[in-house]
């Protein structure tokens, strides 16, 4: 018979494994000397983007990551680590934790999983500095309409010069 405590741990591993397997983004970060008030502030900021921040025991994290076929991430789970799990958003949690880590030196991003691929700290920094989807769409729209705008300006200038040459018309 399985002891109740062991049963809870097995359930925790299974739940975390499922979350990791279905998440779009998982970020591992150190929080060792972060005050509770700052951790709660981070939690509130991430909740706006439908993310979950949770501290799990190291063994549960390691087993869940291994069961989720992300074995390379186990090496980053030494010491006091927390997970940000985002089932829907891809870049927003990365940007949020990156900006939070710049303000709070106690938070150190370690690694993560983006679309089931393990990413390094450098890749996370690159993703965090990308423009948002709305900004990218605005840039695309501006670049698509720029030639038309230049054509309209050129034609307008041509009409203006013709009017100056022939003021009778």
UniProtKB/Swiss-Prot annotation:
Keywords: Ribonucleoprotein, Ribosomal protein, RNA-binding, rRNA-binding. Coiled coil: none annotated. It comes from the Bacteria. The keyword Ribonucleoprotein applies. One of its GO terms (cellular component) is ribosome. GO terms for molecular function: large ribosomal subunit rRNA binding. It holds the Pfam family Ribosomal_L10. CDD domains: Ribosomal_L10. One of its GO terms (biological process) is translation. The keyword Protein biosynthesis does not apply. InterPro entries: Ribosomal_uL10, Ribosomal_uL10-like_sf, Ribosomal_uL10_bac, Ribosomal_uL10_bac_type. Part of the ribosomal stalk of the 50S ribosomal subunit. The N-terminus interacts with L11 and the large rRNA to form the base of the stalk. The C-terminus forms an elongated spine to which L12 dimers bind in a sequential fashion forming a multimeric L10(L12)X complex. Belongs to the universal ribosomal protein uL10 family. Forms part of the ribosomal stalk, playing a central role in the interaction of the ribosome with GTP-bound translation factors. This is Large ribosomal subunit protein uL10.
């Amino acid at each position: 018979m399985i002891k109740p405590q062991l049963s809870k741990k097995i359930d925790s591993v299974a739940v975390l494994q499922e979350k990791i397997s279905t998440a779009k983004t998982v970020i591992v970060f150190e929080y060792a000397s972060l005050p509770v008030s700052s951790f709660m502030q981070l939690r509130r900021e991430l909740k706006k983007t439908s993310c979950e921040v949770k501290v799990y025991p190291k063994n549960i994290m390691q087993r869940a990551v291994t069961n989720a076929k992300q074995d390379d991430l186990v090496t980053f789970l030494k010491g006091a680590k927390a997970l940000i799990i985002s089932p829907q958003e891809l870049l927003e949690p990365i940007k949020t934790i990156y900006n939070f880590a710049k303000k709070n030196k106690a938070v150190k991003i370690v690694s993560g999983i983006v679309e089931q691929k393990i990413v390094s700290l450098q890749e996370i920094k690159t993703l965090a500095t990308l423009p948002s989807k709305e900004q990218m769409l605005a840039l695309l729209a501006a670049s698509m309409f720029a030639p038309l705008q230049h054509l309209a300006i050129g034609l307008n200038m041509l009409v203006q010069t013709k009017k100056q040459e022939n003021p009778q018309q």
